[in-house]
Amino acid sequence: MASTDSKQLYLFKKMLKELKSKKGKGTELISLYIPAGRRISDVAQHLREEMSQASNIKSKSTRKNVQSAIEAILQRLKLLKEPLEKGVVIFAGMVPRSGPGTEKMETYVIEPPEPIKTYIYRCDSEFYLEPLEEFLEDKDAYGVILVDRNEATIALVKGRNINILKKLTSGVPGKFKAGGQSARRLERLIDLAAHEFLQRVGQKANEQFLPLLQEKKLRGILVGGPGHTKNEFVEGDYLHHELKKIVLDTFDLCYTEEFGIRELLEKAAPLLKDVELMKEREAVQRFLKELIKEDGGLACYGEKEVLEALMMGAVDTLIVSEELEKYKVKIACNNCDYLEEKTVNKLELIKLEEELKNAQCPKCGGALSIVEEKDYIEYLSELCEQSGAKLVTVSSETEEGAMILNAFKGIAAILRYKIHQ
């Protein structure tokens, strides 16, 4: 994963998370989606009409706040340059900082990762984010079918998520060793029950996967399981012929449930190299492989150690948890050249802002203020770009991501060379 792609995706997700937390007092927050090709002059004309309509709002404060938000958007439109290749999204409104009377106008201009297709103007108590959230959904998915004579699991691997869709059991008894006509008849009944079970598995797989294939959201199907049943399933007429065309491979496995899915994903890693889950897993497993070497290998973890390695240009791959909610802040004196840098979490940042109101410069006694506040992962990504290191952000929702967050405090690295002998 390229550092710039990982950085942009992280910042986009962080922005959506922040916007989702904004709540207005009444229906005062405006969301404006401008599609590619829409003339800015037409949008401005529509907003002026909405400004006129807003004058009919009964509540004086709501009327004032809505009109102020529209005016803020109109001012931002003047700064946009046509043509808008992907369109643009603008959010504006009076957002309370704490209690009543603490409202402040906030305006956000977002360039979407993909083209906006529909013009939307919405005034509500919260920003309308669904069209942007759709961009975060992984478009491509892989179907997984694990099957043996006793049970089957049908699942979908999409981005970082493994979603188990169906679990089926056969009730087929094991083979009998005893001979005789009755034993042969019983064996035929067992084979028939196994055949009917595979038909049921195929039917459920068709129900789950065909709609995704028709929507062009299914890239392939992986089939696995212990024994020969998986081969019978693929070679027989159990799966729809269009789905059979996208069966990528079959895999010998020990399990047919959740453990089997993880076993299959490991064996299918070369086929799934573009799936986000596999990128995370590969990076974390590389790190752990280095970590358990007797000499410590090329592994490094902990904020101080990783930062040192980044500054030296020794990091090959930086692994950071998305839950690492920290900020890099610069504190400067308003009178002299005093400058201080700190790394703080969200609560510490709020506390620091309050403390600085009464703080004095240790150099000249002047007033201190925060002159720069940067998301910590954004700061780390810039260090990666300077040294050519790869950045991988991991979600705490995955097993590997949770390990990085909990066991290594959210930050780890694979080195190019050892920095301490």
UniProtKB/Swiss-Prot annotation:
InterPro entries referenced in this protein's UniProt entry, alphabetically: eFR1_2_sf (IPR042226), eRF1_1_Pelota (IPR005140), eRF1_1_sf (IPR024049), eRF1_2 (IPR005141), eRF1_3 (IPR005142), Peptide_chain-rel_aRF1 (IPR020918), Peptide_chain-rel_eRF1/aRF1 (IPR004403), Ribosomal_eL30-like_sf (IPR029064)
Keywords: Cytoplasm, Protein biosynthesis
Source species, domain of life: Archaea
Cytoplasm found in the keyword field: yes
Pfam families the record matches: eRF1_1, eRF1_2, eRF1_3
Localization per Swiss-Prot or TrEMBL: Cytoplasm
An example Gene Ontology CC term for this record: translation release factor complex
GO molecular-function terms, A-Z: sequence-specific mRNA binding; translation release factor activity, codon specific
Classification via HAMAP family: Rel_fact_arch_1
Quaternary context: Heterodimer of two subunits, one of which binds GTP.
Function per UniProt: Directs the termination of nascent peptide synthesis (translation) in response to the termination codons UAA, UAG and UGA.
Family of the protein in this entry: Belongs to the eukaryotic release factor 1 family.
Protein name: Peptide chain release factor subunit 1
Organism annotation: Methanocaldococcus jannaschii (strain ATCC 43067 / DSM 2661 / JAL-1 / JCM 10045 / NBRC 100440) (Methanococcus jannaschii)
